[in-house]
Design a protein with these regions (language model features):
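Amphipathic alpha-helical polymerization modules
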Residues: 1-140
Length: 140
């Protein structure tokens, strides 16, 4: 009976460890999403700043803007947009890869926790029967 109790306690400890790991992974997932959101905001702010500088450059030129100047400004704006679009896509790809990795760990752990729960329940039933049998034996 003592071995049964020790086994149950070991399983309970194992389950608690896995659940704590799952909570850490969930927190890591939230932190990853928050960090990604903050980085996206920074990238978009940088893009806005660069576009504003180009706009100032255009506004600071003489009263009349030549077609070449206007075309050059449009090209700069297009380059800026492409640069920051690429930065955002790279960030999203990294974030999604990290999220998938964390979610896979969480998902892989779930069946183990369920299996340990089932084992604990089965061992508890065995312990209950054994305790009941001992009690009955001692009463007779």
């Amino acid at each position: 009976m003592l071995n049964l109790l020790l086994t149950i306690l070991t399983y309970v400890d194992l389950r608690a460890t896995w659940q704590a790991d799952a909570m850490k992974d969930s927190q890591m997932l939230q932190d990853t999403q928050l960090q990604s959101s903050n980085e996206q905001t920074q990238i978009m702010q940088q893009q806005t700043n660069e576009e504003a500088l180009v706009q100032l450059e255009l506004e600071g030129s003489e009263d009349s803007v030549s077609t070449e100047q206007y075309t050059a400004v449009l090209q700069k704006m297009s380059q800026i947009a492409a640069k920051f679009e690429s930065l955002l896509q790279n960030l999203m790809a990294k974030t999604q890869a990290k999220e998938r990795e964390i979610e896979q760990r969480i998902t892989a752990r779930e069946p183990k926790i369920k299996a340990v729960d089932a084992d604990i329940e089965s061992l508890q039933e065995t312990l209950d029967k054994s305790t009941e049998e001992q009690f009955t034996y001692m009463q007779s």
